[in-house]
């Protein structure tokens, strides 16, 4: 099998293609590398100005080496092999959007560090119980959640009570699975 692409190699390809220096860039796209990236290695720490980093559609198993990304606001890790959220604490103070659909995440341990997270797209993962889902209520800014395709959502959607049950547990949500959340008791604001 072909050797995995390293972050360093992916960054130098990106630099060739865009003509920008990775250390200066605000947005860096390293998605769908051939062969895929398997590790978030220490080369990421050079991306001090990066606000949006895309590493989707690779074979990454662990979130790591984000400590140098002091300005990171959007992290895209969809379609990888990520099993947990460890490693996010390094960007807990800045990250506003986490796109992590199509992975193998079962537990949401570690999500509570995301003090500014507004948007969480984590469809098609493996979360199956309310105890895990409840950890999302600890996120003070979360307002847009996509959770479709997790066993928990599939079970309750089949029973017809997903939106009610989910919004009861995470009452701050404004949007769930792409649909605006309408609260019955809210008065029309004029």
Swiss-Prot record:
Localization per record: Cytoplasm, Cytoskeleton, Cilium axoneme
Gene3D superfamilies: Ribonuclease Inhibitor (3.80.10.10)
Keywords of the record: Acetylation, Cell projection, Cytoplasm, Cytoskeleton, Dynein, Leucine-rich repeat, Microtubule, Motor protein, Phosphoprotein, Repeat
Gene Ontology biological process terms, A to Z: outer dynein arm assembly
Main location: cytoplasm
Pfam families listed in its UniProt record: LRR_4 (PF12799)
LRR repeats: 49-70, 71-92, 94-115, 116-137
Entry's Gene Ontology molecular function annotations: alpha-tubulin binding; dynein heavy chain binding
InterPro entries, A to Z: Leu-rich_rpt (IPR001611), Leu-rich_rpt_4 (IPR025875), LRR_dom_sf (IPR032675)
Tissues in which the protein is found: Expressed in the respiratory epithelium of the upper airways and the ependymal cells lining the brain ventricles.
Domain LRRCT: 150-190
Residues bearing PTM N-acetylalanine: 2
Modified residues (Phosphoserine): 56
Cellular-component GO terms for this entry: microtubule; outer dynein arm
Task of the protein: Part of the multisubunit axonemal ATPase complexes that generate the force for cilia motility and govern beat frequency. Component of the outer arm dynein (ODA). May be involved in a mechanosensory feedback mechanism controlling ODA activity based on external conformational cues by tethering the outer arm dynein heavy chain (DNAH5) to the microtubule within the axoneme. Important for ciliary function in the airways and for the function of the cilia that produce the nodal flow essential for the determination of the left-right asymmetry.
Similarity field: Belongs to the dynein light chain LC1-type family.
PANTHER family for the chain: DYNEIN AXONEMAL LIGHT CHAIN 1 (PTHR15454:SF33), NISCHARIN RELATED (PTHR15454)
Subunit structure: Interacts with ZMYND10 (via C-terminus). Interacts with DNAH5, a outer arm dynein heavy chain. Interacts with tubulin located within the A-tubule of the outer doublets in a ATP-independent manner.
Note: Outer (ODAs) and inner (IDAs) dynein arms contain the molecular motors that generate the force to move cilia by ATP-dependent reactions. There are two mechanosensory systems that monitor and respond to the mechanical state (curvature) of the axoneme. One system involves the central pair microtubule complex and radial spokes and the second system involves the outer dynein arms.
Protein name: Dynein axonemal light chain 1
Source organism per UniProt: Mus musculus
Record gene name: Dnal1
């Amino acid at each position: 099998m072909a050797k995995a692409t390293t972050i360093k190699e992916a960054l130098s390809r990106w630099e060739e293609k865009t003509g920008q220096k990775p250390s200066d860039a605000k947005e860096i796209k390293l998605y769908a590398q051939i062969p895929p990236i398997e590790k978030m290695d220490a080369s990421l720490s050079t991306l001090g100005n990066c606000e949006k980093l895309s590493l989707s559609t690779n074979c990454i198993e662990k979130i790591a080496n984000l400590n140098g990304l002091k300005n990171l606001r959007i992290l895209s890790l969809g379609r990888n092999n990520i099993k947990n959220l460890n490693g996010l604490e390094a960007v807990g103070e800045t990250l506003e959007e986490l796109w992590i659909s199509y992975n193998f995440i079962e537990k949401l341990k570690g999500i509570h560090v995301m003090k500014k997270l507004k948007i969480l797209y984590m469809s098609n993962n493996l979360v199956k119980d309310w105890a895990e889902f409840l950890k999302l209520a600890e996120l003070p800014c979360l307002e847009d959640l996509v959770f479709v395709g997790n066993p928990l959502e599939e079970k309750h959607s089949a029973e017809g009570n997903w939106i009610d049950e989910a919004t009861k547990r995470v009452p701050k949500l404004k949007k769930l699975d792409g649909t605006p959340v309408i609260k019955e008791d809210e008065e029309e604001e004029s």
